[in-house]
Every structure is written in structure tokens, then in C-alpha cells.
Amino acid sequence: MIELDHVIVNARDRVASARLLASLLDVPWDETALGIFSAVYVNPGLTLDFITTDEDFPVEHFCFRVSDAEFDAILKRLEDAGIGWRGDVRGRNDGKVGTAHGGRNIYWDEPDKHRWEILTKSYARRPG
């Protein structure tokens, strides 16, 4: 089986971006895990390696499948942090939760404009 091991995430401030995501997801992180990277340990098999850059970089989208309890906890942490969210990939933050595809999902944008998503039921699986 092929598994995704790590992803490099560009940021204006790798430490601040990694710290914020780790706190929202309630996962461990390391400010200087690999020298120039601040690592967010999403799960035992996936690390997001944040790197600081002054160069232009594209806005990326990252989605995490979570349990209902994790969804509720992350939503509460977003609310406590004053970070807005929405139930649709486009549009303004309206505090709504998406319910398409038989689960719940929300999107939020972080300071570098990357678009983060959590969902309780994947809609991206190949049928069969």
C-alpha cells in the first residue's frame, strides 16, 4: 500500500503556522524538528513540515477526516481562537457547518491563505 508520509507547507512564519494548526487539531508539533522545518505530527504516518519562505507560493487545500468527537472539539477550538469558518469551500465565513455527503465539514483559512478542511465522512473515495 502506498501512503503519504509528509508534505511541505510553505508559510511566511513556519513556527506560528505550525503552532496554530497543531493547537487547533490538538496534535504534537516540533518547532525545529528538522532544522528548517517546523513539523506538525498529524498522525503516526503523516507529518506536515512547515517551511518559512519569502517567495510567492500557491494557496493549498488540506483536508483531514476526523471523528464526530474530534470535529466538535476542533470546531470549539476554532471558535475559542476567534477563527471563522464556513460549510462551503467558497464564500465568506458564516459559521455554518456543511452537511453534504452524509457527514459534516467546515473550511477555514489560515493567515497564509491556505484552506484547511475537516470532515467526518469522506466524499473523495473511489467507488467500489
Show which residues each predicted segment covers.
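Short, conserved charged micro-motifs
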Residues: 16-18, 69-74
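Short amphipathic alpha-helices in soluble, non-transmembrane regions
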Residues: 22-24, 75-80
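Vicinal oxygen chelate
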Residues: 81-128
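Short glycine-enriched loop/turn motifs at secondary-structure junctions
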Residues: 1-3, 55-59, 99-100
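N-terminal beta-strand motif that seeds the catalytic metal site of vicinal oxygen chelate
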Residues: 1-15, 61-62, 66, 122-128
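Core segments of cupin and vicinal oxygen chelate
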Residues: 2, 8-48, 54-55
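Short beta-strand micro-motifs in enzyme catalytic cores
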Residues: 36-38, 60, 102-106
